[in-house]
Amino acid sequence: MTKAQESVVISLYNGNLTGDSFEKTEELRRYLSDLVKTYSTTDEIDGEGRTEDSHFFHIPEDILFITYESVLSNDDKLGCAKGSIMEVVPVTQDELHKTKENPFRGSNKRRVLRLDVGDYTVELISSFSIDKYQIRYLSKPEPIILIDLPDGLTIGKTDTFPGDKENMCKLNPAIHRTILEVAVNLAIKSRVPSTGK
């Protein structure tokens, strides 16, 4: 069930299940609304960056996909833009140099670049100080556990989720049948011997 739930969530997000992406219709937004969370931090951490303008922040461990992110800067160098919200634009490691040097795509008074550096850490690139980093994201769904598990056995244990107690699907009930159908199909596929195709 857990694998089916994860598959359905990812398919709804990227549009493979319905042909529309997660925020395109009210129906799709409702299916995943229980997984949408907001996180903000003012705690910059140490890190070795790709540029002299790098700032590092931790992000939550339950992130599946970031759907929106912004920063707030009160840097005096911003002039009248001081205290304004700046959008954050993700870039790949390969794109960073040419994007950073492009005056229309690089970081500026309205835009900050983001690199994913692993270990639930992001590198934000801005020549201005960053006072607050905020994200809205789709979180990983908690595993579906149909019965309490025997001692010592856990599924998806985290600091906030014990992983050994009965836990039903927390998603919108309208999507439960789809998750069940995917789970049945996965179970059937796992029992059918491979024909070598």
Give each language-model segment a name.
Residues 1-197:
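Glycine-enriched, solvent-exposed interface loops adjoining structured elements
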